[in-house]
């Protein structure tokens, strides 16, 4: 049950109500609260009150489990050492430091011959210098070199609110994730799998709209002896991927495991039933022909003649049977320049119509055809998922400005690339008509609370139209979001622990001006500059390693700061035993250790593809303040030796494409609700309403009526209308 409790706390920042005998636990509860505050967390008043009425043993057990969970959330579950023992003080000039390493190597009897040989060639490999890349002191020695952190008003204090009994909290979390209207990230999908197995015999969501989520739930249902929920052949393919711990999004090939006879029968029966009810769905096989071929090798459909329709699936995959695809019919109409016919046919598949909208508008040669396209969209909009409606609305909003510029493509795994935009412009009048229609459709679906309280800081948070546009962690917001940054010192950190091979990750920060040209950078090749310091290069992490960059925001030249993690050598982010990135904010006079959990504002896992990670960027506003712009991007990079110097042009181009693209935000939805008659008011913590309200903010405030509807980043997906 400890694992389930950790999931609830991580996802909801709610502490399940502990089960235990009554007692006098007030002293232990206060000590628990104090321990939480040392790592940037705090018990809500209700949680503290409830714990105080339980036995001391119950409180202590709860504290031990909870502290372990929140320390991991903040990145405090590992030891963060630094190369330069008193970082950020006394960081040397880069050349001075390298010369010192060479001098020490020449004084080393073992290293001396090799260094002299390298000096004769004029090139020295830093990794051959004994004092380079490895810690020269213990963790305890590093701690002794730093003053204690002085508390400040700006330190993070994340409140843990009291939840219900653990069983109720687990069920609620399962229903929320399974019924999400947006795809979940890989970490949340894995959590859904754990919850689905635990909740297989309990309440189930009325609907599971996202296919990837359905696959994970189906895998749990099958293991529990229940029938899977299937209505397309692709549902069966995704289920097979889930059972093999593969990619349920079908973006990457899955190596199918040997399946038991029971599972093979269930999958074949599912395929047979889907095709028997709707033979046209055989066309979906063509989209994933190779995957179905590989699945057929595991299912042995020839051994089960009672399911002949299942055999047809694999016959289509092998090319032995024809299946006329819907997409083929659409292409034939486009080929005949019949835009009206294409729009009419696509209207029978509303999602495909919305995804083909740009092409339809560009292909329409007459006003009659353009009117037909708009009319088709208006007619079927109520049948399209809210996520797709909002995605197309955002796309149309940016379409006019993007024409002729660079296009940024980001796949579902977060890998990004840039290309020229060679598309023709779409008709402006129709673009505006469609935007108005989608606004009206979204407004129709939104709730209509009498009163909505909004934290102003949440208005610039991008709508989570895909869970894959974010990452698991603390304080993480969806890609494209803007959030305020307050503090004199901005400190980045990366931690990694290699699994099998020597692995070297390099933390860097690129500084760009208003035109996205390079001003400077901080990395192991430039340890110190006007803006700040680098903690030193660590090149091997068998027991884990950390690197830091300290920046004085007031001294930063330029407009943008782009931290990045480059894989210089070794294991990919997905291969390492553990890897995460984050940033801290503090005032100069606070001092403290290089890593102080209560100053951590954001910590996220590094688990994407590619060899260069770009978690977020920081930009200076016109008034001189700073904001974080959330990216969650990965660049393919080079197989080895990735450095900030080698990717600065690509990073600048990507950043420009994202910064100049306007996202649909929470502010967009609240404006629609206000226009529909909801009273929207700015949250004022000084006057908490007594009656139930709907609240949207970055954190759940204390004192709200228990029947209030509360939306925070942890459940922001609930804001997306179905």
Residue ranges and their predicted role:
Residues 1-722:
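Intrinsic-disorder/low-complexity signal
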């Amino acid at each position: 049950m400890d694992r389930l409790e950790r999931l609830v706390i991580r996802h909801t920042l709610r502490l399940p109500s502990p089960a235990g005998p009554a007692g006098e636990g007030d002293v232990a509860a206060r000590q628990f609260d104090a321990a939480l505050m040392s790592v940037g967390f705090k018990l809500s008043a209700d949680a503290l009150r409830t714990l105080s009425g339980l036995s001391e043993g119950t409180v202590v057990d709860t504290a031990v489990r909870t502290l372990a969970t929140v320390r991991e959330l903040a990145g405090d579950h590992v030891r963060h050492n630094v190369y330069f023992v008193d970082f950020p003080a006394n960081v040397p000039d880069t050349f001075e430091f390298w010369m010192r390493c060479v001098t020490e190597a020449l004084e080393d009897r073992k290293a001396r011959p090799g260094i002299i040989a390298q000096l004769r060639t004029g090139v020295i490999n830093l990794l051959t210098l004994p004092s380079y890349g490895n810690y020269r002191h213990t963790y305890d020695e590093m701690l002794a070199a730093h003053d204690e952190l002085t508390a400040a008003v700006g330190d993070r204090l994340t409140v843990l609110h009291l939840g219900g009994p653990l069983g109720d909290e687990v069920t609620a979390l399962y229903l929320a994730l399974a019924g999400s209207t947006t795809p979940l990230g890989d970490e949340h999908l894995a959590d859904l799998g754990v919850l689905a197995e635990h909740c297989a015999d309990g309440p189930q969501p009325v609907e599971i709209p996202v296919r990837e989520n359905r696959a994970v739930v189906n895998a749990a249902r099958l293991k529990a002896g229940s029938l899977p929920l299937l209505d397309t052949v692709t549902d069966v393919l995704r289920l097979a991927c889930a059972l093999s711990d593969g990619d349920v999004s079908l973006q990457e090939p899955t190596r199918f495991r040997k399946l038991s006879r029971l599972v093979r029968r269930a999958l074949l029966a599912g395929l047979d039933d889907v095709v028997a009810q709707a033979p046209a769905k055989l066309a979906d096989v063509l989209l994933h022909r190779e995957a179905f071929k590989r699945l057929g090798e595991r299912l042995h459909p020839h051994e089960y003649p009672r399911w002949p329709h299942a055999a047809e699936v694999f016959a289509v995959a092998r090319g032995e049977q024809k299946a006329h695809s819907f997409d083929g019919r659409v292409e034939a109409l486009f080929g005949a320049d019949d835009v009206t016919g294409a729009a009419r046919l696509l209207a029978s598949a509303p999602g495909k119509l919305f995804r083909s909208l740009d092409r339809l508008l560009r292909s329409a040669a007459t006003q009659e055809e353009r009117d037909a396209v708009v009319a088709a969209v208006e007619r079927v909009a109520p049948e399209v998922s809210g996520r797709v409606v909002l995605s197309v609305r955002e796309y149309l909003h940016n379409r006019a400005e993007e024409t002729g510029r660079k296009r940024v493509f980001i796949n579902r795994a977060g890998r990004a690339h840039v290309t020229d935009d060679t598309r023709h412009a779409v008709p402006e009048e129709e673009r505006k008509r469609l935007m108005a229609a989608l606004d009206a459709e979204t407004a129709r679906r939104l709730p209509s609370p009498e009163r909505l309280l909004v934290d102003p800081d949440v208005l610039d948070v991008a709508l989570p139209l895909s869970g894959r546009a974010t990452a698991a962690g603390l304080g993480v917001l969806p890609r494209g979001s803007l959030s305020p940054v307050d503090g004199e010192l901005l400190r980045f950190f990366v931690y990694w622990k290699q699994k099998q091979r020597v692995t070297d990750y390099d933390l860097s920060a690129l500084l760009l001006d208003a035109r996205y040209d390079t001003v400077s950078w901080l990395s192991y090749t430039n340890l110190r500059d006007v803006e700040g310091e680098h903690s030193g290069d660590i090149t091997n992490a068998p027991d884990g390693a950390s690197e830091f960059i300290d920046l004085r925001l007031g001294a930063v030249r330029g407009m943008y700061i782009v931290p990045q993690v480059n894989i210089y050598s070794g294991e990919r982010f997905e291969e390492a035993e553990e890897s995460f990135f984050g940033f801290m904010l503090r005032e100069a006079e606070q001092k403290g250790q290089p890593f102080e959990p209560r100053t951590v504002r954001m910590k996220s896992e590094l688990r994407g593809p590619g060899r260069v990670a770009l978690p977020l960027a920081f930009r200076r506003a016109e008034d001189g303040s700073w904001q974080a712009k959330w990216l969650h991007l990965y660049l393919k990079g080079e197989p080895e030796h990735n450095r900030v110097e080698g990717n600065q042009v690509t990073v600048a181009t990507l950043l420009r494409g994202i910064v100049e693209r306007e996202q649909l935000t929470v502010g967009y939805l609240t404006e629609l609700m206000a226009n529909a008659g909801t009273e929207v008011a700015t949250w004022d913590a000084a006057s908490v309403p007594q009656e139930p309200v709907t609240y949207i903010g970055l954190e759940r405030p204390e004192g709200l009526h228990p029947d209030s509807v509360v939306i925070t980043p942890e459940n922001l997906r609930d804001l997306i209308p179905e």
